[in-house]
């Protein structure tokens, strides 16, 4: 067996090629050895197990034995060359047989990618903004209001409809004077302003009294999901059957009990809400800072990435998306989730993975046991029995590995912050929580 030095190809700076030459005589010996081994256990009609003549075994299994022998020899030759040259192979090699080889030899080329050299750039000019927010009574009040709205009940109202009411209607829609598919319903309930109906439709219903009928024109949005209606002018006739006004629960003992405060103490409820908010605010601020830190690393560390790793990551992201859809009860066979959809995300994740690995290795940022324990205990604080979650994490190594990965990311973020320019900026509660109007 002979191999030549790996060669960089011109198309891809990370692609390499190793040429290999395998002696036919060596392959023949390997084939014969495989056939003899197979003959010991192969079963054929008319022969006892292990008594089939080698010639007959060769006639039946010869091509399979030769293919396996060549595959094993190529794999062995490739592995030896990779170790000899200290190459870090990314993905699997593509084996290409050569049409014209030397006499008495089989010649192949192994084409593969290697991991890039990662040199993290200077972060001193990178700016990272750290949001700040102190959770106070106003934030607690807003959150309790959200919790109240989630428990809204409705009572019959003897007045015209207004925003927030739950109404029941009959309606019929016409396009060019003809009823269109999906445009009719009876005893149809919806909450005005909840967004379940088109805004123009909801607006037209406001001000109606029970028993009143209204006819109005509207135009479907250009991006409406029903293509035959997108951008089309239509006319609706609506009859109001009932109107119910929203009623929010009082913040009292019953409300507190409904939210898990056993003794119904409202002050205790506010304390729990504040504690949960502080944890959520911390988590969201950390996420914003982490994203900036990752962007900074990418900005100062331009690298080529192996296509094989990006393709593998995109495939994994697509599979994750399918599992998520299936968990929501959707039939993924009807939804053609393609790895290509995740190309940019996969590229970013692979780049960051390579860069972070270099940062961790070069700066000894591996997770310490006490850091992992601290993170797990912090996450457990939002549970009724924190010790149960801690035990759950420590019961399986793979669960603890997830916590370890988070700690390592936090260590990298802290390292970036120590190198970059940082500043603090107050952020509004609604902006941080995504509730801004």
Swiss-Prot record:
SUPFAM superfamilies: FKBP-like, Triger factor/SurA peptide-binding domain-like, Trigger factor ribosome-binding domain. GO terms for molecular function: peptidyl-prolyl cis-trans isomerase activity; protein folding chaperone; ribosome binding. The keyword Isomerase applies. One of its GO terms (cellular component) is cytoplasm. Pfam families: FKBP_C, Trigger_C, Trigger_N. InterPro entries: PPIase_dom_sf (IPR046357), PPIase_FKBP_dom (IPR001179), Trig_fac (IPR005215), Trigger_fac_C (IPR008880), Trigger_fac_C_sf (IPR037041), Trigger_fac_ribosome-bd_bac (IPR008881), Trigger_fac_ribosome-bd_sf (IPR036611), Trigger_fact/SurA_dom_sf (IPR027304). It is found in: Cytoplasm. Keywords: Cell cycle, Cell division, Chaperone, Cytoplasm, Isomerase, Rotamase. The keyword Chaperone applies. It catalyses: [protein]-peptidylproline (omega=180) = [protein]-peptidylproline (omega=0). GO terms for biological process: 'de novo' cotranslational protein folding; cell division; chaperone-mediated protein folding; protein transport; protein unfolding. Residues 164-249 form the PPIase FKBP-type domain. Its EC number is 5.2.1.8. Involved in protein export. Acts as a chaperone by maintaining the newly synthesized protein in an open conformation. Functions as a peptidyl-prolyl cis-trans isomerase. Belongs to the FKBP-type PPIase family. Tig subfamily. NCBIfam families: tig (TIGR00115). Consists of 3 domains; the N-terminus binds the ribosome, the middle domain has PPIase activity, while the C-terminus has intrinsic chaperone activity on its own. This is Trigger factor. The gene is tig.
């Amino acid at each position: 067996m002979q191999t030549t030095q790996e060669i960089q190809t011109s198309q891809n700076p990370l692609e390499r090629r190793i040429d290999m030459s395998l002696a036919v005589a060596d392959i023949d010996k390997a084939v014969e050895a495989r056939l003899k081994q197979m003959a010991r256990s192969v079963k054929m009609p008319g022969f006892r197990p292990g008594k089939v003549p080698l010639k007959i075994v060769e006639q039946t299994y010869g091509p399979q034995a030769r293919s396996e022998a060549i595959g094993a020899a190529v794999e062995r030759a490739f592995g030896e060359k990779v170790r000899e040259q200290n190459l870090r192979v990314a993905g699997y090699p593509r084996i290409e047989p050569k049409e014209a080889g030397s006499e008495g030899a089989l010649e192949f080329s192994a084409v593969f990618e290697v991991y890039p050299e990662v040199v993290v750039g200077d972060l001193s000019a990178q700016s990272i903004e750290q949001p700040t927010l102190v959770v106070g009574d106003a934030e607690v009040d807003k959150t309790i209001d959200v919790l109240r709205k989630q428990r809204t009940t409705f009572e019959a109202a003897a007045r015209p409809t207004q925003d927030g009411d739950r109404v029941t209607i009959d309606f019929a829609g016409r396009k060019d004077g003809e009823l269109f598919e999906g445009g009719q319903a009876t005893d149809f309930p919806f909450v005005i302003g909840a967004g379940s109906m088109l805004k123009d439709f909801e607006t037209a219903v406001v001000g109606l009294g029970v028993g009143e009928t209204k006819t109005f024109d509207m135009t479907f949005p250009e991006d409406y999901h029903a293509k035959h209606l997108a951008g089309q002018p239509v006319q609706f006739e609506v009859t109001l059957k009932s109107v119910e006004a929203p009623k929010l629960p009082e913040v009292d003992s019953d409300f507190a009990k409904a939210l898990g405060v056993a003794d119904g103490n409202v002050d205790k409820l506010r304390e729990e809400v504040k504690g949960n908010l502080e944890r959520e605010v911390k988590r969201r601020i950390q996420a914003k800072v982490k994203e900036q830190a990752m962007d900074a690393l990418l900005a100062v560390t331009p690298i080529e990435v192996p296509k094989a790793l990006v393709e593998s990551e995109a495939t994994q992201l697509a599979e994750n998306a399918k599992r998520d859809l299936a968990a929501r009860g959707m039939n993924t066979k009807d939804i053609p989730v393609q790895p290509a959809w995740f190309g940019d995300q996969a590229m970013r994740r692979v780049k960051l993975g390579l860069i972070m690995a270099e940062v961790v290795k070069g700066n000894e940022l591996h997770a310490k046991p006490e850091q992992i324990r601290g993170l797990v205990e912090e996450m457990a604080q939002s549970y009724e029995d924190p010790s149960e979650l801690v035990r759950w994490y420590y019961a399986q190594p793979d669960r603890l590995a997830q916590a370890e990965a988070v700690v390592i990311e936090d260590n990298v973020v802290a390292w970036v912050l120590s190198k970059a320019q940082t500043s603090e900026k107050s952020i509004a509660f609604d902006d941080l929580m995504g509730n801004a109007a």
